[in-house]
């Protein structure tokens, strides 16, 4: 929460310039956006090799020290997800170590904010819980908003419009201590909404008694929100 507050206060301080591009989730520095073709080209430039098995298309390569398959998902011809799946399966003990290592890496990366604590303990019986209770083992993180790319003027306007439902222009121009606190709280709320558009999460997948990790880099701006209904 302290990190989020710092980010939002920095956002308030830097609300002075136009955005050059949309701030979306990135994978290896590549925005999760655009067309499948452009995304493939960018991934190939990172060393990934296109593969096709039947009708299933993906790219193969190395990511974070593991051999992986990368899948591109779209909505209305716009990329909204990069899915990264381990190429090799491991046993229960090894997957717990891998899961916890990933949690630690994300927790110690200043570019991410966790929603909760996700570390598995020695007592966690993954096989039993997944088989009997259909439990999901997932960890959710969010990429910190890039204020050089964020639409700062748009954010300022959003904060202002929300506050105008409670206060007058004059009160916002010369805010009291109470209104100043309300301005910060509103900015934190809107900053959190911005952050939630950039989720990166992973889960344990079980297949035939073996396990692997699937990671998801999602661009919530491009996901389906029922507009085609």
Regions found by a protein language model. Name each.
Residues 42-64:
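A compact, surface-exposed functional segment
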Residues 57, 79-80, 211-212:
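Hydrophobic residues embedded in beta-strands of well-ordered beta-sheets
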Residues 20-50, 88-229:
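Non-cytosolic coordination micro-motifs
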Residues 4-19:
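Sec-dependent N-terminal signal peptides
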Residues 18-20, 81-82:
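A short alpha-helix capping/helix-coil boundary motif
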Residues 60-105:
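Mid-chain, structured segments of secreted extracytoplasmic proteins
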């Amino acid at each position: 929460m302290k990190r989020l507050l710092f980010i939002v206060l920095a956002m308030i301080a830097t609300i002075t310039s136009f955005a050059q591009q949309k701030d979306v989730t990135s994978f290896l520095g590549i925005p999760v956006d655009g067309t499948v073709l452009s995304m493939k080209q960018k991934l190939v430039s990172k060393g990934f090799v296109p593969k096709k098995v039947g009708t299933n298309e993906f790219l193969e390569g190395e990511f974070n020290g593991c051999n992986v398959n990368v899948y591109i998902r779209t909505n209305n011809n716009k990329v909204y997800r990069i899915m990264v799946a381990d190429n090799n399966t491991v046993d229960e003990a090894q997957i717990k170590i891998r899961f916890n290592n990933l949690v630690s890496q994300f927790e110690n990366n200043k570019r991410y904010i966790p929603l909760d604590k996700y570390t598995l303990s020695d007592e966690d019986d993954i096989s039993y819980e997944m088989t009997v209770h259909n439990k999901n083992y997932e960890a959710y993180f969010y990429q910190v908003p890039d204020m050089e790319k964020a639409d700062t003027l748009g954010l300022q306007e959003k904060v202002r419009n929300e506050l105008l439902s409670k206060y007058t222009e004059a009160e916002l121009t010369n805010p009291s201590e109470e209104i100043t606190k309300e301005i910060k709280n509103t900015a934190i709320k809107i900053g959190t909404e911005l952050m939630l558009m950039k989720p990166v999460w992973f889960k344990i997948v079980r297949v035939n008694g073996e396990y692997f990790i699937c990671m998801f880099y999602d661009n919530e701006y491009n996901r389906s929100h029922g507009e085609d209904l």
